[in-house]
Amino acid sequence: IRDSYNLLQGKPELIEDSKTIDLEKDFVPTLINEKKSFWDEFNFGNIALTPLSFVYWSVSTFKNTFFKPKASNEGEVPVVVVGNVTVGGNGKTPLVSQIALDLKNLGFKPGIILRGYKGSFTGTKLVNDNTTAKEVGDEAIFHFNRGFNVVVDRDRARALSYLERNTDCNIVISDDGLQHTSLRRDFEIVVEDANRNFGNQLFLPAGPLRDNIWKTKKVDLFIY
């Protein structure tokens, strides 16, 4: 879409009586709104999926009740977790990158752990110059290109352990991971899209929630 947009903007001539279309402003938002509309309202589809949502809610509530994440012990690298209670891109990655940059400017040596969304690699991977986005996903490459040590692993606790053993990081930021109770943490940040809010406030798959809304009142910082 972006390439098409650039081509359109670079056209020297337009068909008579035609209207210039800005794909970024006119077309992309429409696609996003259509994708989200199902979770933004109540309809027959939502109602049909509520039994599955109840299962998801039960698992989430059970984990929040009986599996409390531990804080770092003395001598361990502190961990900051940035996540959200809804699915979708709500600005976690740019926020993580900015936090890491600010910490670096303050004299810290931040490292970043993440799942590696859409990457093909399975296991634990310390991103290096030869690592591709196809292996670890765009987000991991984005963080690495900004000068940070990055470890990709679906198991965030294992990623943290690997990062501690193989780098000189003295603080770690988890890009997503709020729901990973096995990952120790010392500071939790939840970021959500204020325009979208919490949609229809139903759990997956009937709605966008993957955690209880009250979780936003339990974390250290809620960015909304």
Kindly label every feature range from the protein language model:
Residues 1-4:
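Conserved small/polar residues in nucleotide/adenosyl-binding loops
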Residues 9-12, 16:
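Short Gly/Ser/Thr- and charged-rich N-terminal loops/segments
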Residues 31-78:
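A transmembrane-helix-recognition feature enriched in membrane-embedded lipid enzymes
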Residues 52, 111, 224:
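Residues lining hydrophobic/aromatic ligand-binding pockets adjacent to catalytic sites
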Residues 55, 93, 143:
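A residue-level signal for conserved active-site and pocket-lining positions in enzyme catalytic cores
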Residues 65-126:
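Walker A (P-loop) phosphate-binding motif
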Residues 119-224:
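Phosphate/Mg2+-binding loops and adjacent switch elements
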